[in-house]
Amino acid sequence: MLLELARWLAQDIRGFNVFNYITLRAVLATLTALTISFLVGPKLIRKLTEYKVGQSVRDDGPQTHLVKAGTPTMGGALILIAIVISTLLWADLSNRFVWVVLITTLGFGVIGWVDDWRKVVYRNPKGLSAKAKYFWQSLIGAGVAAYLFHTATVPAETELIVPFFKHLVLPLGAVSFIVLTYFVIVGTSNAVNLTDGLDGLAIMPTVMVASALAVFAYVAGHLYFSKYLGVPYVPGAGELTVFCAAIGGAGLGFLWFNAYPAEVFMGDVGALALGAALGTVAVIVRQEIVLFIMGGVFVMETISVMLQVGSFKLTGKRIFRMAPLHHHYELKGWKETQVVVRFWIITMMLVLVGLSTLKLR
């Protein structure tokens, strides 16, 4: 929106051409999202408290979590507001990828909103039924996958890139691309949601991964940088740098209120949306495997649930004291803040490994 205004003004005042630089707009998107979070956050928290939009806590969870009952939830709406406004202000709105990620993010956010609303209104910690949730997630995920495949303008947009191997590129047909994209988007969405169980646990890894994806998006959308680093060139992908920067700013702003002891929880409206956003960006910039590496904490949390459920159904025994994984460590005696910070450190290490794939080929 502001980019178009700047381009119009640049016809008479050349200084406005500076807004054509993606890097500048990414910085401004971060600051804008951060500012919106700081300004809107306290008001939103007061409203959520006033309307008693409080978190329901599972009876079978760690006993230390019982004090969290009643803490305002659905704070993910704050994140989405900041991301959307910031992106609309600073991104190139003629870029199709910008609209793909915005629509996907908001679509999953709506699913999360309904899920949270049912938890609040009906006082049911399980919220929306699993079948209904996965149906709508699948519908959006498959739709986005089909759109991206059929609107691809260069072969690189539908190729699977294997990190650390310079020339290992796997062309994907329609079915394989759509299936892979579906699992990346839906899988990441649910993985972030599973991780969002402790104060600040999910949001900081999300910020770190989004920041790294911003780098990949910038490189993938830059003809010369992509060629130099051996990254597939995806025309238009650079604008996703602005979107990822908005996620980073909104996430840090939310962390201000979500840090232990949390004043507000993001709820499914935030977790499902953020996971879908990360997955969609990774697909567009062709870094699905790198996302798997950088989002290792999300992966571990998801696998722990799958192993726990599978083991209990097959043998009647549990592998972990409780799943997802963060609860296992809580029951082992780790303090909540220890689990959170240690998972942050792990994510930081994995993000650095992911970024190293830009050069180590």
Swiss-Prot record:
Membrane spanning residue stretches: 21-41, 73-93, 97-117, 134-154, 168-188, 200-220, 237-257, 264-284, 289-309, 338-358
Keywords linked to the UniProt accession: Cell cycle, Cell division, Cell inner membrane, Cell membrane, Cell shape, Cell wall biogenesis/degradation, Magnesium, Membrane, Metal-binding, Peptidoglycan synthesis, Transferase, Transmembrane, Transmembrane helix
Cofactor: Mg(2+)
Superkingdom: Bacteria
One example of a Gene Ontology biological process annotation: regulation of cell shape
Function: Catalyzes the initial step of the lipid cycle reactions in the biosynthesis of the cell wall peptidoglycan: transfers peptidoglycan precursor phospho-MurNAc-pentapeptide from UDP-MurNAc-pentapeptide onto the lipid carrier undecaprenyl phosphate, yielding undecaprenyl-pyrophosphoryl-MurNAc-pentapeptide, known as lipid I.
Enzyme class, UniProt record, top EC level: transferase
Membrane topology: Multi-pass membrane protein
Localization of this protein: Cell inner membrane
Pathway(s) per entry: Cell wall biogenesis; peptidoglycan biosynthesis
Pfam family, one: MraY_sig1
Species assigned in the record: Methylobacillus flagellatus (strain ATCC 51484 / DSM 6875 / VKM B-1610 / KT)
The protein's name in its UniProt record: Phospho-N-acetylmuramoyl-pentapeptide-transferase
Gene Ontology molecular functions: metal ion binding; phospho-N-acetylmuramoyl-pentapeptide-transferase activity; UDP-N-acetylmuramoyl-L-alanyl-D-glutamyl-meso-2,6-diaminopimelyl-D-alanyl-D-alanine:undecaprenyl-phosphate transferase activity
